[in-house]
Amino acid sequence: TPDATLPVNSIVTPNGSSSIVEGGTTAGTNWFHSFDRFNLPTGSTVLFDNAATIQNIFSRVTGNSISNIDGLIRANGTANLFLLNPNGILFGNNAQRDLGGSFFASTADRIMFADGGQFSTLGAGETPDAPLLSITAPIGLQFNRGNAGIIQANGSQLSVPKGQTLALIGGEIHLNRANGDRISPIAQLWAPSGRIDLIALWEGEWGLDGTLLQSPLTPDRPP
């Protein structure tokens, strides 16, 4: 369900068990979406219908519920997809990706950009940051609250194309069997000739290049 926090708001058009995400706010080669809730029921499909020029798709959840993903997420071309929900993200047994780029799922509070811009999930007391949406590349994720949500994959089979990154970055990362028993397969992750990041971070900043930028146990980053 889209919210109304962007200059151009997201539009979700349902068609049977499928949905198409359009609208959103474009800044250079970045495409921003904002949702009050983001869930994908079993057997359903959502397509982020991006233009061929888009390199990064950013989607955030500003409401208070976790995201339950148990269907197929698609995007066009080689765009990277970022899903940000500080409440938590649950990937079910039927969760799949059909992406040409990398996939980042995180319970961080905000995405940081090279020019100092941020894409925040609008925590308590914050104001919408839509006018500051950046045209530059994303460089990291920031955890401010000290109680980041959990990312859980229950028998999921998550993959990205050759040479891309599959990243799950949250307060805790749980890779479980589909039914919680000893027979069902455990969650499986694939990134052939690429990179898989499983990062548990309650507070601090994590660089998208795979480095810790700042934590309560490290000094502040240099200016």
Regions from the language model: what does each represent?
Residues 1-223:
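Extracellular and secretory-pathway beta-repeat/beta-biased strand scaffolds
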